[in-house]
Amino acid sequence: NTVETDGQTYEVDKITYSTDEDGENKYDEMIESVDIMGNTTKYDRDANGNVIKTTNADGTYTLANYNSKNSVVVEVDELGYATIKAYDSNGTRLLKEATSLHPLSQTDINTVTADNFDPVTYLAANEASYAITSHEYYADSYVSGIAGLIRATTDPEGNVTEYDYYKDGVGKGLVKSKTLKDGNTVVNTVSYEYNAQLQVSKETTSFDISKNLYSVKEYEYDKFNNVTVTRDYGTGSTPATTVAEYDLLSRKTAEYA
């Protein structure tokens, strides 16, 4: 599209793609886009086609770095704040995700965006500068035929969430329960049951662990995965029932209690 302004003609709402030596664009890789207002965004890519720099119309930019599996290991925003992701030796399981507490210096930016950057080594040396979430995994044999199940996640405050999974049946490989701990103290538990469509049909949440009290909710769905009926039992046996209706675009149109 073209727009004329002050006697000048500009192309807007336009995308430019990269091409190989034969002049072909095989992988739908953009190098530049111009929006309807004429703002231009540019994209730099590595040898594998991953976007490593995005330059905005105002000259600010974001940076990214990738591992050998083409998974993002570094993202640096326009202000210099970084998110670092450390994977296992295979480059597939996320072990740590860290967000910088302060903008990085240019030296650190150069370090984290360099080829062959090692997030594990870097985070070990710079833990104090990041808020870090870490993950532990079950052995691949824990649930037959399903690998990569997270056993526990520790947030930046040190709170630990432990996960258990269904080993067979309808919900095989889906989360059976979550347990939140503060140190060795159980703070909260949530357990799940699933229907034949693998949607959560029942959710049981601890209300008062010391008194063994739990609140229960049950759910029904339509064929578009919208929740149509919610039964909230609280800690009792009589539910408060809520019914929801949706239009053909899955927008909620009515709710009755």
What positions do the PLM features span?
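Beta-strand elements of repeat-based all-beta scaffolds
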Residues: 1-56, 60-257
